[in-house]
Amino acid sequence: EIYTLSLHDALPIFGAGLPHVSIPRRAVNRIVLTGTVGLSAGARSWALYNDIDVVFLSRHGNYLGQLSGPRSTTSARRLLAQAELAENDHARLPLAQAIIRAKIRHQLNVIHRAGRRDRAVDITTTCGLLRTLLADTGHAGTIDELMGIEGAASTQYFSCLAALVPDDVTFPRRSRRPPKDLANAALSYAYAILLSECTGALIAAGLEPSLGVLHASTDKRPSLSLDLMEEFRPLLVDRTVVSLLRSHRLRPEHATASEDGEGIWLNREGKKALVDGYEATLQRRVKGALPGFSGTWRRHIHHAAQLLGRAITEPDYEWTGVSWR
């Protein structure tokens, strides 16, 4: 179903003659367009003038790109620092280790929280293995070794997470291209949205998203965005998806098979349920997750991007990630 979206005293976003949804301008801080959706020239100008990011996702939720206003504060000094770090595997290893440590810590916390609600699932073995892998990050001598530890942790983590979803949801393991079941379809779709959030936050912080620390720099992906989102994957996406599945707000009928039968994608109702849950998570206010900072999780992503910028440009700054219990 296609809607005409307009802003009070502003511009129509989609063509005339379609169902109409009205939203106050002050309530808009980002426009996400999914699939083959048009955006008028007037709407583009309004968004750019007001520093409203316009994010484009494919109909399957893959991040395609975005329009961003002139607020980008990328400086030559910061860009040079990023480039120098990206080309020095030895120099970027400590920050890469910190990124993976933060991710594994949050994976542990997600399992602990879900396990407390479902005593029938034994999380002891998985938690023990994750703690061992968490300690191993400090002994990784190369980025490749570190990525191997991260992969091992994710395998253990998703295996345990699969036991925490309802019996009518098939979730044997993490599958990506394409996702093979409802849980994986929801994770992939939400990760794509989170990637756009992180890319926008990095641009706002004056950083170049393609120059990564953990993920190798390339023109084909926003590597630093993937770095920033690592710790937020379990924190914001995984626990949201598990919560939606356990509360049956996301159900098997919300998934549909691809035309070639190779993958599973969310249908319109599934996307709405997921986006509603994701937005509720990002609008939740938290305090103490970052030193001296409080606000919504969305604001935490932006603040975390600024701190990541400090870690890149200030060698003595120790980046530790978000603290979440």
Spans of model-derived segments:
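N-terminal ordered "arm"
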Residues: 10-36
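A surface-exposed, charged beta-strand/loop segment in the N-terminal or early-internal portion
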Residues: 27-30, 34-109
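Short helix/loop capping segments that flank catalytic or ligand/cofactor-binding pockets
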Residues: 13, 41-42, 65-66, 197, ...
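Mixed-charge, polar/low-complexity N-terminal
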Residues: 12-14, 18-20, 49, 168, ...
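Single conserved hydrophobic/aromatic residue that forms the stacking wall/gate
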Residues: 1-9
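Active-site helix-to-loop segments that bind/position phosphate- or nucleotide-bearing substrates
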Residues: 6, 22, 76-325
